[in-house]
């Protein structure tokens, strides 16, 4: 590479070191179907080895949002990689798809190999947990686009599901039950408001909250639901699923419901993590609005027939997932969600 390019602000050698540092982490994620991985112009994946009759590919992309600012300010970068994967694979999981592979995009002011390695380690940890191959990525050094120390992370996930097993909500009916899977905390949404409230409160993020440092609570990575939900799908007919992200209950649960139906949710049927109480009190936020911003303790929902509820809860418990019967489906022409207890 020419000296002129390096003089323009791009550190080629730092990029090489970052690639070398991340390689061992990436190798941990490989699946037998991967033909070509990092290093080529395009990564390849052999769908014929999936033993599916009529595979449907499902793709999704997402970022981590301004949660990144907290991670950057406090030098904790590995959990952000987990968030990047979780936001993507949890989304495509709602169709019943098994995640197959993942690609990342990291853009930064200046490549710091140690930081890039931490991010990719987190990505790889999440990929290993969800059996998702990290088969490609891009690290872009753009000094004029970002302030010193800043970076952004985005992810891209592709999965597959048998055409006959595709979950689209079309089988949702009155009387079916909504099961909520517990979140790990705030996950990766609402952080513009979270950061505003942190700044207004003037709290010491190193101080303890609920027996943990505040910063650890705020940076707790998004929960990965792939393993427990796929295990559930093998045993129980799932009618619809939702990943509770930006917009909370109000914007996400209706996305999987046919017209004319609503999910009637009892907000007293599951515990709300204490951090949401802190946020609500700090911002003097109406309870109804909280459910329109945050996951409030439920990060993912599945809808099943009433006869399958006990079995579903048992399977999820065996997968070490806290789950609750949080509501049921009713006929409603005017709204797609009814929240009780707010």
From Swiss-Prot:
Keywords: ATP-binding, Cytoplasm, Ligase, Nucleotide-binding, Purine biosynthesis. It comes from Staphylococcus aureus (strain bovine RF122 / ET3-1). It holds the Pfam family AIRS_C. It comes from the Bacteria. Pathway: Purine metabolism; IMP biosynthesis via de novo pathway; 5-amino-1-(5-phospho-D-ribosyl)imidazole from N(2)-formyl-N(1)-(5-phospho-D-ribosyl)glycinamide: step 2/2. The keyword Chaperone does not apply. One of its GO terms (cellular component) is cytosol. Gene3D superfamilies: PurM-like C-terminal domain, PurM-like, N-terminal domain. One of its GO terms (molecular function) is phosphoribosylformylglycinamidine cyclo-ligase activity. It catalyses: 2-formamido-N(1)-(5-O-phospho-beta-D-ribosyl)acetamidine + ATP = 5-amino-1-(5-phospho-beta-D-ribosyl)imidazole + ADP + phosphate + H(+). This is Phosphoribosylformylglycinamidine cyclo-ligase. Its EC number is 6.3.3.1. PANTHER family: TRIFUNCTIONAL PURINE BIOSYNTHETIC PROTEIN ADENOSINE-3, TRIFUNCTIONAL PURINE BIOSYNTHETIC PROTEIN ADENOSINE-3-RELATED. It is found in: Cytoplasm. One of its GO terms (biological process) is 'de novo' IMP biosynthetic process. Belongs to the AIR synthase family. SUPFAM superfamilies: PurM C-terminal domain-like, PurM N-terminal domain-like.
């Amino acid at each position: 590479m020419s000296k002129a390019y390096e003089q323009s602000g791009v550190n080629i050698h730092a990029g090489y070191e970052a690639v070398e540092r991340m390689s061992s982490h990436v190798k941990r994620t490989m699946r037998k179907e991967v033909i070509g991985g990092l290093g080529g112009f395009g990564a390849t994946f052999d769908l014929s080895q999936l033993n599916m009759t009529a595979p449907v590919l499902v793709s999704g992309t997402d970022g981590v949002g301004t949660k990144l600012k907290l991670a950057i300010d406090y030098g904790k970068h590995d959990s952000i990689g987990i968030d990047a994967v979780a936001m993507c694979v949890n989304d495509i999981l709602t169709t019943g798809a098994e995640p197959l592979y993942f690609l990342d995009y990291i853009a930064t002011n200046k490549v710091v190999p140690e930081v890039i390695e931490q991010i990719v380690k987190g990505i790889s940890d999440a990929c290993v947990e969800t059996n998702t191959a990290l088969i490609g990525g891009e690290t872009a050094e753009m000094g004029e686009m970002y302030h010193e120390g800043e970076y952004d992370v985005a992810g891209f996930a592709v999965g597959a599901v048998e055409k006959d097993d595709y979950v689209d909500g079309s089988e949702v009916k009155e009387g079916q039950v909504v099961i909520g899977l517990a979140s790990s905390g705030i996950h990766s949404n609402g952080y513009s408001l979270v950061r505003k409230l942190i700044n207004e409160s003037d709290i010491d993020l190193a101080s303890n909250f609920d027996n943990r440092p505040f910063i650890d609570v705020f940076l707790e990575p998004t929960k990965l639901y792939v393993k427990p939900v796929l295990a559930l799908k093998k045993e129980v007919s799932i009618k619809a699923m939702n990943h509770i992200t930006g917009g909370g209950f109000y914007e996400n649960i209706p996305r999987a419901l046919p017209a004319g139906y609503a999910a009637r949710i009892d907000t007293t049927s599951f515990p709300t993590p204490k951090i949401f109480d802190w946020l609500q009190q700090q911002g003097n936020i109406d309870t109804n609005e909280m459910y329109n911003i945050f996951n409030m303790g439920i990060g993912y929902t599945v809808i099943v027939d009433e006869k399958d509820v006990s079995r579903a809860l048992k399977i999820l418990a065996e997968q070490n997932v806290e789950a609750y019967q949080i509501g049921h489906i009713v006929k409603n022409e005017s709204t797609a969600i009814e929240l009780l207890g707010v």
